[in-house]
Amino acid sequence: MKKNVEIKKLGINGEGIGYIDRKIVFVPGALPQEEVIVEIIKQTRTYSEGKLLQVVKPSKDRVTPKCRSYDNCQGCTMLHLSYFKQLNAKKEAVRESIRKYTEYDLSRTIFKDVIAAPSQEGFITAVNLPIVDFKGKISFGIYQRDSKYLTLMTRCFKQHPIINECLLKLEEILTTNKCKTYSDKFRTGLRFLKVKLIDNKLQLVFITGRDWLKEEIVKEISQLPHVASIFMSVNTSKHQEFDELGYSKLYGATRLELHDDKNQYLVSVKSKLPENIEMMWKQNQTIKSSVQDSQKIISLNCGIGLLELNLDQEIVAIDEKRYQIDDAKLNAK
């Protein structure tokens, strides 16, 4: 069933919101002030979902996404909206979430503008990707929600170029060596790849079945540019909490060094880093300026102490993961 819909606002997940016969309809890919033609693909008693077929009257804020897979990939939801309008939308999403899910009085809070990122391209420095078989080639990609569509992640414009270059080289090495992707039946093969880029050095973690990675393949990977360490973990369970079983080091440094203007931090294979390191430093400076009048601070989910070690006050730092605390203690020395 096709319908004309006028989009009134954005939802908290970036989808356009309009109304048909006073019932709300969610339209991914549509923007406020747009008139669109949609196909209704789902109806419930309280709402409908529409697939965007045509933009009859486009918004002045609509832009052409740089991602070549944007129409099918669901990893990003607002690339068709100009960047600074995205920031406004994110601020409103926070306000709307607080209004909808809490009893907090919004009139008591001033919502400041979202701080823009230094770069909108090449900023992702940590990725976790399934290892997939695509047209007879080993690659790295993600399957989209509620579909069998595969998005290859070897050329994602948001990922740092060093990561993309490494993924392409790994494709070549793993395919040439006739590696296999994971088989639930036999519990063998390559399952996941975790990559961290820290000060232009790569930490690679392979999650495999019972057959591990061959020594000659590890040696070939170790010779790639920027590769500083390689780890592996055998995991044949259904869940994806790989940290619990630990990792075996196959090559290189046990910990990598991360630097800011004043300090050096050690990062182990288990420790988590934000995907946008540049933005994290900016965030830390904002938080530091906001707590200047505080004498004692409790920090929950402190990680390895990247924020806490830059604060001047007395800090009580808490994290549920022991390995995060171990790294934080090393960094505090």
Language model features: what each stretch is:
Residues Q33, Q159, N276:
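Short, conserved phosphate/pyrophosphate- and ester-handling motifs at nucleotide-, phospho-/glycolipid
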Residues I37-E39, N128, I298:
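Hydrophobic beta-strand signal
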Residues Y182-L197:
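A short glycine-rich, hydrophobically flanked beta-strand micro-motif that places a catalytic Asp/Glu
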Residues K3, K9-I12, G16, W212-K333:
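Rossmann-like S-adenosyl-L-methionine
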Residues V195-G209, Q264-S268:
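Short, aliphatic-rich beta-strand segments
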